[in-house]
Regions:
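N-terminal beta1-alpha1-beta2 submodule of the flavodoxin-like/Rossmannoid cofactor-binding fold
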Residues: 1-102, 156-180
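Short, histidine-centered active-site or binding-site loop motifs used for metal coordination
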Residues: 14-16, 114-116, 149-151
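A glycine-biased structural micro-motif
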Residues: 106-107
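Short, glycine-/small-residue-rich phosphate/pyrophosphate-handling segment
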Residues: 110-147
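Short alpha-helical linear motifs
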Residues: 133, 151, 168-169
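Short helix/strand-capping connector loops at secondary-structure junctions
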Residues: 145-157
């Protein structure tokens, strides 16, 4: 177990717009685990709705959208969960990231949790999200968590190994951020 500074800000993002989706379940576990640390944590859950579509650098977006972009920009660490859709990460996640100014994110750290119905596409999506993080000059934990949907049931993670791997991803990502 690592000791982290209270002034470290963590943003957990559930990148699926589907309510009660496996991505949301997975990232709620991450939020609960992070809350045990001595850090500030916020949760952006795209399934809650109310996030606008990016239309360029205009100022008339709703408060929820602008606050999410501000929270992401101010966070030291991004813990991102995304489903795989046709070997691609979530378009809703991509839309949210469009609101973030890459000039204000250098040196941040990200951890990834990726969920799919089967075993195909994980490294494709890992590569795409890592490249996106690179554009934002965000250092990405090289060990993501890959989860298949059969590890979820009745709104819960049913595989203890998945919980353990998510916890390890959080710890390693926070340790990487601490060293950065």
């Amino acid at each position: 177990m690592y000791n982290f500074q209270i002034d470290m800000k963590i943003e957990v993002i559930s990148g699926s717009r589907r309510e009660n989706a496996n991505t949301e379940i997975m990232m709620k576990h991450v939020v609960e685990y992070v809350k045990q640390k001595d850090v500030e944590v916020k949760f952006i859950n795209l399934s809650e709705g109310g996030f606008e579509y990016y239309r360029g650098w205009v100022s008339n977006y709703n408060e929820k959208t602008l606050q999410a972009a501000k929270d992401i920009t101010e966070a030291d660490v991004w813990l991102i969960g995304t489903p795989i859709y046709n070997s691609m990460y979530s378009a809703a996640l991509n839309n949210l990231i469009e609101f973030v100014n890459y000039k204000e994110t250098e040196g941040k750290t990200a951890g990834l949790a990726i969920i799919a119905s089967g075993m195909i596409g994980f490294t494709d999506v890992q590569t795409l999200v890592t490249q996106l993080m690179s554009y934002f000059r965000v250092i990405t934990n090289p060990v993501p968590v890959f989860v298949t949907a059969d590890k979820m049931a009745d709104g819960k993670i049913i595989d203890e190994d998945v919980k353990s791997r998510l916890n390890q991803m959080v710890d390693k990502t926070l340790e990487l951020a601490k060293r950065n």
